[in-house]
């Protein structure tokens, strides 16, 4: 939650509207980042508890959201937009980062499980996906985006960060494939790019499409800032409205507030230094997520650090929300 306080200037950079490539206009530059509320009702559907929560968030500004019958989701979208902002659905496939005992097959780019020492057994051992399974997953993202638009959401965000499935394909230590989805960065990014193409084709031109991407995996030999720069450039021709920058995975949870650089932590924005570097060459607006909890920090990011930022914040229970637009900063999911 971004605390209310006096800003750093008479005209705050947090509040001007942001025109996206799709033509959608966001009211300001603060976003509630997508998260797991763990509040689903019977049948894993949104119910009155989550609608109440989103009405409260909507009173403060723009929101992003996560993942059946369409009516409960339509009610969810309506609640999220009740304050006049926009609501986007985040679409995710966890891949190997799925708890042990979950029904079904655990998928991954390769048969490499999550390595967390004595906690590794908490996650299922993945099976390397076949080309047909990869194509089916791409289709499922597109179908979900189409249904999200029908339900009244204003956009979707493809989750390709935090060690989830598209992020696993991007990561050299996890993706050991030798086919068209492995090896070079272009091959490792193929699944994500195919997902974005399919999603963009499945929705209307005015429907926003975003991607959540690691600025770095924070693992030896992993996806890094230079990789992120190249992937952002690959996404631009596909009609992406913005890219949300985060970092880490379950194995290296930088997104929880454990960044590699202590000075960045002290300044309150976990991935600010990486974002400052990436924004110089990014052809699309960037949203910065992680650790921006005070208005003065958010304004410093916008005034002095990241030229085109969007600030996202998440916490379901407390205080007022300072509204904003362009690129954002928050806590992870």
Question: Which residue stretches match the model-derived regions?
Answer:
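Flavin-dependent oxidoreductase catalytic cores
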Residues: 1-333
């Amino acid at each position: 939650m971004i605390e209310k306080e006096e800003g750093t200037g008479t005209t705050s950079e947090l509040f001007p509207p942001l025109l996206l490539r799709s033509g959608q206009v966001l009211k300001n530059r603060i976003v509630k980042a997508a998260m797991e509320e763990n509040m689903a009702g019977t049948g894993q559907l949104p119910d009155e508890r989550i609608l109440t929560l989103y009405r409260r968030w909507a009173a403060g500004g723009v929101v992003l959201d996560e993942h059946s019958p369409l009516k409960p989701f339509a009610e969810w979208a309506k609640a999220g937009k009740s304050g006049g902002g926009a609501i986007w659905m985040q679409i995710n496939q966890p891949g190997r980062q799925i708890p042990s005992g979950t029904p079904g097959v655990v998928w991954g780019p390769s048969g490499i499980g999550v390595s967390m020492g004595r906690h590794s057994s908490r996650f299922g051992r993945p099976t390397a996906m076949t080309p047909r399974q990869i194509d089916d997953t791409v289709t499922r993202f597109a179908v979900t985006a189409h249904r999200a638009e029908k339900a009244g959401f204003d956009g979707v965000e493809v989750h390709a960060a935090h060690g989830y499935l598209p992020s696993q394909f991007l990561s050299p230590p996890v993706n050991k494939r030798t086919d068209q989805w492995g090896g070079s960065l272009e091959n490792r990014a193929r699944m994500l790019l195919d997902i974005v193409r399919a999603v963009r084709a499945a929705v209307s031109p005015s429907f926003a499409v975003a991607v959540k991407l690691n600025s770095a995996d924070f693992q030896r030999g992993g996806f890094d800032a230079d990789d992120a720069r190249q992937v952002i450039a690959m996404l631009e021709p596909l009609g992406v409205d913005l890219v949300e920058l985060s970092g880490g995975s379950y194995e290296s949870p930088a997104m929880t507030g454990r960044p590699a650089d202590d000075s960045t932590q002290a300044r309150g924005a976990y991935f600010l230094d990486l974002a400052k570097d990436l924004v110089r060459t990014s052809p699309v607006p960037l949203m910065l997520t992680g650790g921006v909890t005070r208005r003065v920090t958010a304004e410093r990011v916008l005034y002095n650090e990241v030229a085109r930022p969007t600030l996202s914040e998440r916490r379901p229970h407390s205080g007022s929300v300072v509204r904003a637009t362009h690129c954002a900063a928050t806590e992870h999911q």
